[in-house]
């Protein structure tokens, strides 16, 4: 009997030893307890992270806050995390290629976990999970329930319908199903109508900023409601942070105007107020974003726009379509009137894209590898009598650093050639209309001709590979730019130094 009891205790101890630990209400998972956690929890959100990842560090307190909130509510949803650098088998199994990667598991299903796509604040996480595990809109039986919903999040939407089976109510529910990161409620209770000053059916968006609420006007259709929410769910001016980035770059509005403003500047409040005043005229058309130009985490954003801290305050506009295009105001005045005028002229198509360029170094052509900037690119690359091979690089790029000595040797090889030029251009500081650079390094060949031909190089990055390409007139090693981009994306996650810059590239 004693032996059996001891055996049971030993088995129980082993089970407990392998059970997930908790850190700030977040389950700590490993390969040894991952399956057990999936079996124990109907809904499980898992973050695959790396200890060195800045984005993961920024997410950690919000992730823990969300976990604590759900646990306190007695929810069936649990949050967990996996150190992907230690648990490489799990990371590979679930296709982790960047950090953080967050996946949602339902009923232990490991075949098709859902990718988490919402923001990185606690409310965003909780709202997304509740929408994934519950009804599209919560039924609100009384004023207390409605007030609780409104107070629970930065933004909430309530549909007021005297008949919740009406066509309008059904359109409302369809809109609710389409949005993951905002809580929706629906009510037919007359007291709730009175509480929020409604005497007929309607939809109201409640928010803890700007005007506080927006009443929907017009025909209640899914499309109209989604458009209404898109126009009103973000503040007139939203600060760019680690937490707000997914809302900014994942939203429907792809034209962004950015105010680079140090919070330490003496007239900070006045300049921000001017920016906000201008924003009132462009809701739903242009997203107004404020960036603290003094903050260390934002320096690479400044670099992307060719700005230095001492040049701020400054305004820039960017379109986030397939080809990102930047625009610069003609005036440096940051009054509401000037910013409004700039936005109107942009929307009317009267503003030309802004292309960055460094100053041309005096010795740009004194070395075997010629230095190109925006100002001399056209003259050199499209010289009808020269075959020009150009490396478009970024100073921070690990692949570019590896290529540098080989590229220098290539320059030495052809320094005395009468019609072959080896060149390089820093694409983080220089832009040209003729070439769009999507990854680093990008290698392009400009053969001697009058038709402005551009050939992408996608061969081996070796001296012999480059020489064969040049001696073949740009044939041996030629390939599509898309192929090169795929190669870079496959390689980059292994380069830790590129993590932050890759995030900037992905977001911008």
UniProtKB/Swiss-Prot annotation:
GO terms for cellular component: cytoskeleton; cytosol; endoplasmic reticulum; endoplasmic reticulum chaperone complex; endoplasmic reticulum lumen; endoplasmic reticulum-Golgi intermediate compartment; external side of plasma membrane; extracellular exosome. Residues 471-508 are annotated as: Disordered. Disulfide bonds join 53-56, 397-400. Belongs to the protein disulfide isomerase family. Residues 1-17 form the signal peptide. Changing residue 331 to E: Phosphomimetic mutant. Does not affect enzyme or chaperone activity. A motif (Prevents secretion from ER) lies at residues 505-508. Its main location: endoplasmic reticulum. Heterodimer; heterodimerizes with the protein microsomal triglyceride transfer MTTP. Homodimer. Monomers and homotetramers may also occur. Interacts with P4HA2, forming a heterotetramer consisting of 2 alpha subunits (P4HA2) and 2 beta (P4HB), where P4HB plays the role of a structural subunit; this tetramer catalyzes the formation of 4-hydroxyproline in collagen. Also constitutes the structural subunit of the microsomal triacylglycerol transfer protein MTTP in mammalian cells. Stabilizes both enzymes and retain them in the ER without contributing to the catalytic activity. Binds UBQLN1. It comes from Homo sapiens. The modification N6-acetyllysine is found at residue 200. InterPro entries: PDI_thioredoxin-like_dom (IPR005788), Prot_disulphide_isomerase (IPR005792), Thioredoxin-like_sf (IPR036249), Thioredoxin_CS (IPR017937), Thioredoxin_domain (IPR013766). This is Protein disulfide-isomerase.
């Amino acid at each position: 009997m004693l032996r059996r009891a001891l055996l049971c205790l030993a088995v129980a101890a082993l089970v407990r030893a392998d059970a997930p630990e908790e850190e700030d209400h977040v389950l700590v998972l490993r390969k040894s307890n991952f399956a057990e956690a999936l079996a124990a929890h109907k809904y499980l959100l898992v973050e695959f992270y790396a200890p060195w990842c800045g984005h993961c560090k920024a997410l950690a307190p919000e992730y823990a806050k969300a976990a604590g909130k759900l646990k306190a509510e007695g929810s069936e949803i649990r949050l967990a995390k996996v150190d992907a650098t230690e648990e490489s088998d799990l990371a590979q199994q679930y296709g982790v290629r960047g950090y953080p990667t967050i996946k949602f598991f339902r009923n232990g299903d490991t075949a098709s976990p859902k990718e988490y796509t919402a923001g990185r604040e606690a409310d965003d996480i909780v709202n997304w999970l509740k929408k994934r595990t519950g009804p599209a809109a919560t039924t609100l039986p009384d004023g207390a329930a409605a007030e609780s919903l409104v107070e629970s999040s930065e933004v909430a939407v309530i549909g007021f319908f005297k008949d919740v089976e009406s066509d309008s109510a059904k359109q409302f529910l369809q809109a609710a199903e389409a949005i993951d990161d905002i809580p929706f409620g629906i009510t037919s209770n007359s007291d709730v109508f009175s509480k929020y000053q409604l005497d007929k059916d309607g939809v109201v968006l409640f928010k803890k900023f700007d005007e506080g609420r927006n009443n929907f006007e017009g025909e209640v259709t899914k499309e109209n409601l989604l458009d209404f929410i898109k126009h009103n769910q973000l503040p007139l001016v939203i600060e760019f942070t680690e937490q707000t980035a997914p809302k900014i770059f994942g939203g429907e509005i792809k034209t962004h105007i950015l105010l680079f403003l140090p919070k330490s500047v003496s007239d900070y409040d006045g300049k921000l107020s001017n920016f906000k005043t201008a924003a009132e005229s462009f809701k739903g058309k242009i997203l107004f974003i404020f960036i603290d130009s003094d903050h260390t985490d934002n320096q690479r954003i400044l670099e992307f726009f060719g700005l230095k801290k001492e040049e701020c305050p400054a305004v820039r506009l960017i379109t986030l379509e397939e080809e990102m295009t930047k625009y610069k105001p003609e005036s440096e005045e940051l009054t509401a009137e000037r910013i409004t005028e700039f936005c109107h002229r942009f929307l009317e198509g009267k503003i030309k894209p802004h292309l960055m360029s460094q100053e041309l170094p005096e010795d740009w052509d004194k070395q075997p590898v010629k230095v190109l900037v925006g100002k001399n690119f056209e003259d050199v690359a499209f010289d009808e009598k020269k075959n020009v091979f150009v490396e478009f690089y970024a100073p921070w790029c690990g692949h570019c650093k590896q290529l540098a000595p080989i590229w220098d040797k290539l320059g030495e090889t052809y320094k005395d050639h009468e019609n072959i030029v080896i060149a390089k251009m820093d694409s983080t500081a220089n832009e040209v209309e003729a070439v769009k650079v999507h990854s680093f390094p990008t290698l392009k060949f400009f053969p001697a001709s009058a038709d402005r031909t551009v050939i992408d190089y996608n061969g081996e990055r070796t001296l012999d590979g480059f020489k064969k390409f040049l001696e073949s007139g740009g044939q041996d090693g030629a390939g599509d730019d898309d192929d090169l981009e795929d190669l870079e994306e496959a390689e980059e996650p292994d380069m830790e130094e590129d993590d932050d810059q890759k995030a900037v590239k992905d977001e911008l």
